[in-house]
């Protein structure tokens, strides 16, 4: 339905409406068309559900979320994007395949843009308390060296492109990721998820929406956790933020 009345007094509204991503097209190339859709539907949704938590899912999710925050004028906790929740899950899964350990015991995050400039935070990734860089032998007899980490990061970034090339769209995995986010809100789980809230002085990064580990509960996006970063991670995240901000400015936001 395209009737906003069905969302009246909703607790959570997940917005997936957006331009369709074509094979070979980056998420950022979708920005103009998708933001145009947001400009039409968001004011109507805010009118019927001013207290709802708005979870943006449409790509490019970080830019769309920033524009949505400006369009709605809602408090920063109420508007955030799905971020890299799915990317983080994919990274942990690939680590589990390399090490033979349960995904539940792997702790690590992907931050930044949900897209080509995203940054795996390897320096804080661990398995059962053991830093990934000190893990030792992997199942193939190798070690978790830089080459292996880069391959995992590449596979995570390319996974959506491969799916789009194969069947034309992504739906199941991102649906599960959004389900996890909505569950964290409705059940007030206070769960750490790499959603995309508005950042203000997060490791010196401000005025941009991008994925960082964030405590998510009934009030939406809460505290943004400032994990220790290496100089390289901070530099790459700053570059990712600059790029996202530039795209938003190009759209008039």
Regions found by a protein language model. Name each.
Residues 72-78, 87-231, 235-253:
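C-terminal substrate-binding/catalytic lobe of Rossmann-fold NAD(P)-dependent dehydrogenases
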Residues 11-14:
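N-terminal Rossmann-like NAD(P) cofactor-binding module of classical short-chain dehydrogenase/reductase
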Residues 1-9:
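Short acidic low-complexity segments
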Residues 8, 22, 62-66, 88-90, ...:
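Short, well-ordered, mixed-charge alpha-helical segments that flank or form enzyme active sites
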Residues 24-28, 226-228:
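Short acidic, glycine/proline-rich loop/turn micro-motifs
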Residues 17-19:
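Conserved NAD(P)H cofactor-binding loop of Rossmann-fold oxidoreductase domains
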Residues 26-93:
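Rossmann-like NAD(P)(H) cofactor-binding subdomain of soluble oxidoreductases
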Residues 2-3, 82, 111:
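Conserved beta-strand termini and adjacent loop/short-helix elements that scaffold enzyme active sites
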């Amino acid at each position: 339905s395209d009737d906003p009345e069905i969302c009246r007094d909703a607790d959570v509204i997940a917005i997936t409406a957006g331009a369709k991503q074509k094979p070979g097209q980056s998420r950022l190339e979708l920005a103009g068309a998708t933001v145009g859709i947001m400009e039409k539907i968001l004011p109507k949704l805010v009118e019927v559900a001013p207290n709802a938590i708005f979870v943006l899912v449409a790509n490019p999710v970080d830019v769309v979320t920033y524009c949505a925050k400006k369009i709605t004028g809602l408090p920063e906790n109420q508007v955030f994007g799905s971020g890299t929740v799915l990317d983080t899950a994919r990274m942990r899964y690939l680590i589990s395949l390399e090490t033979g350990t349960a995904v539940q015991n792997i702790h690590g995050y992907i931050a930044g843009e949900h897209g080509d400039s995203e940054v795996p935070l390897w320096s804080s990734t661990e398995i059962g308390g053991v830093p990934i860089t000190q893990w030792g032998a992997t199942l193939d007899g190798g070690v978790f060296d830089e080459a292996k980490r880069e391959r995992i990061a590449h596979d995570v970034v390319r996974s959506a492109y491969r799916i789009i090339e194969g069947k034309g769209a992504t739906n199941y995995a991102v649906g599960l990721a959004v389900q996890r986010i909505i569950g964290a809100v409705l059940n007030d789980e206070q769960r750490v998820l790499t959603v995309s809230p508005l950042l203000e002085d997060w490791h010196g990064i401000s005025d941009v929406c991008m994925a960082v580990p964030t405590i998510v509960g009934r009030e939406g996006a809460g505290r943004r956790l400032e994990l220790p970063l290496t100089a390289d991670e901070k530099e790459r995240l700053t570059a990712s933020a600059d790029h996202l901000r530039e795209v938003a400015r190009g759209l008039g936001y």
